[in-house]
């Protein structure tokens, strides 16, 4: 590799934004993106919604057309797993093939789904990659019974999509309320009520004890820790993710940077911002002002937008009804430090601007 070359390990959003920003800011050295999946960078959020519903195809998920990568001299090395990083020799070592040398390295390796310590038969899925979504989509047939283990946003989106496709859906959550760790019990229970009103069987304070298989080895039921049994033709396990940190150096290395879910909160907007920040660090450019945390989710007729960083212990001020509401998380001085907004896009945009100019980001 020529001098000043940048290798980016991870072909997700953070890796793609790093490469794009390097070129946009005038970097003319070699850029290589190495991705473990055999596909170019794509929009992961659509996997649980439009792609699963069949309203978007794989080509429409691409972050950029193939001509973009070629036209900007960004090399994509896909279907390649990096096994080792040598920060001293400045090389990355793929499972097969020759090492790649780098002047600067960006680790954007993302996150992987947390696995349950159970033996899981056929018909049990996770959803992180395009391949996962392909496999799950083939099994979402009308009239079938889907059990979603985990009441997070992705699980709720899959439940919403499957319900619209005509499946019978149950959501199993071990906590007292879904997304309680982020939004608190009060708001989480509001969402659970919304799911129930739409016909979802919601089981709270119940974990997965066992997945039962039929004679063919395929799932036919799940047994919960509260003793109940749910029929299941398909199961989605969505109990969170964990960062893929195996390649991170044990000690800080001046030429090694990290971006995206491997170091961040695991959300689309944060990953994009991280990629931009990594590129600017490499180029020695000043950091951009911090942005308010932002997450969105489309489920059961609601566009949910989380602005800022809510704390479950914060007092919550509610306004609106089941179809359009704002839950404001208040600081000690009574000001809004974060909010969950449902079908309130203009207010969400205004709050993002408001928090951008407040002291909340400094205190978060």
Task: Report each predicted region and the residues it spans.
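Glycine/Thr-rich phosphate-binding loops of Rossmann-like dinucleotide-binding domains
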Residues: 41, 115-116, 156-157, 180, ...
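FAD-binding core/adjacent interface of flavoenzyme oxidoreductases
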Residues: 1-7, 62-147, 205, 223-239, ...
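Rossmann-like dinucleotide-binding cores of NAD(P)H-dependent redox enzymes
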Residues: 145, 153-210, 291-296
């Amino acid at each position: 590799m020529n001098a000043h070359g940048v290798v980016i390990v991870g072909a997700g959003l953070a890796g793609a934004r790093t490469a794009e920003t390097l070129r946009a800011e005038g970097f003319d050295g070699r850029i290589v993106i190495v991705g473990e999946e055999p596909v170019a960078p794509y929009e992961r959020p659509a996997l649980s919604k439009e792609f699963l519903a069949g309203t978007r195809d794989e080509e429409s998920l691409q972050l950029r057309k193939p001509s973009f990568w070629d036209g900007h001299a960004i090399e994509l090395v896909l279907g390649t797993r990096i096994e080792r990083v040598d920060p001293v020799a400045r090389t990355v070592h793929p499972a097969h093939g020759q090492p790649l040398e780098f002047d600067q390295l960006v680790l954007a390796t993302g996150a992987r789904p947390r696995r349950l310590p159970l033996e899981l038969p056929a018909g049990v899925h996770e959803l992180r990659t395009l391949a996962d979504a392909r496999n799950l989509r083939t099994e979402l047939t009308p009239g079938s019974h889907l059990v979603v283990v985990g009441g997070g946003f992705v699980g709720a989106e899959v439940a919403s999509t499957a319900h619209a496709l005509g499946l019978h859906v149950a959501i199993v959550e071990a906590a007292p309320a879904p997304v309680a760790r982020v939004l608190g019990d009060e708001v989480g229970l509001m969402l659970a009520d919304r799911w129930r009103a739409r016909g979802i069987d919601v089981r709270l304070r119940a974990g997965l004890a066992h997945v039962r298989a039929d004679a063919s080895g395929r799932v036919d039921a799940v047994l919960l820790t509260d003793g109940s049994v749910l029929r299941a033709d398909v199961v989605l396990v969505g109990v969170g993710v964990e960062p893929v940190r195996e390649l991170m150096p044990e000690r800080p290395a001046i030429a090694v940077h990290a971006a995206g879910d491997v170091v961040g909160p695991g959300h689309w907007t944060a990953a994009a911002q991280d990629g931009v920040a990594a590129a600017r660090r490499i180029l020695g450019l000043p950091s951009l002002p911090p942005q308010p945390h932002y997450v969105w989710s489309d489920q059961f007729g609601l566009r949910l937008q989380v602005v800022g960083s809510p704390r479950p212990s914060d007092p919550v001020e509610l306004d609106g009804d089941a179809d359009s509401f704002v839950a404001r998380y208040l600081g000690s001085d009574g000001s809004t430090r974060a909010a969950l907004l449902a079908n309130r896009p203009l207010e969400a945009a205004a709050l993002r601007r408001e928090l951008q100019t407040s002291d909340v980001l400094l205190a978060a």
